[in-house]
């Protein structure tokens, strides 16, 4: 049995869709590490430190979840964490092609690393960090898409 999984992402910001997947992964695995990628090429709205803090806040009710920022290759981070599974979310069929390519590349780089795909609950299937940021940027109410702390943090950024 795989006991430790990594759910990687930029989480800029963490959404209810992410939280849904984290909660379900926490039921499937003994330990889940949320790996927050530095990913400066995406020009994140929140710093790595801010994203780590927000994800810790929204996952504090989960005893078997740890939140860690990282840079570099995901497969190297997985090895450092002694994790054998990557958890990835699929919102729509359109996500599958990219995720399939990514899973195959990760398998080539680290043969023992398996990818597991989870789909969000229907009410979260359309939520993306990009859409949430866009709505918030134009003064829209994002409270139904993100944790209260995340909504407040987005308001402060505007």
UniProtKB/Swiss-Prot annotation:
Protease as UniProt keyword: no
Job description of the protein: Reversibly transfers an adenylyl group from ATP to 4'-phosphopantetheine, yielding dephospho-CoA (dPCoA) and pyrophosphate.
Class in the EC hierarchy, top level: transferase
UniProt pathway annotation: Cofactor biosynthesis; coenzyme A biosynthesis; CoA from (R)-pantothenate: step 4/5
Highest taxon, organism lineage: Bacteria
One annotated GO biological process: coenzyme A biosynthetic process
Gene3D superfamilies tied to this protein: HUPs (3.40.50.620)
Name of the encoding gene: coaD
Documented EC number(s): 2.7.7.3
Pfam families assigned to the protein according to its UniProt record, in alphabetical order: CTP_transf_like
Protein name: Phosphopantetheine adenylyltransferase
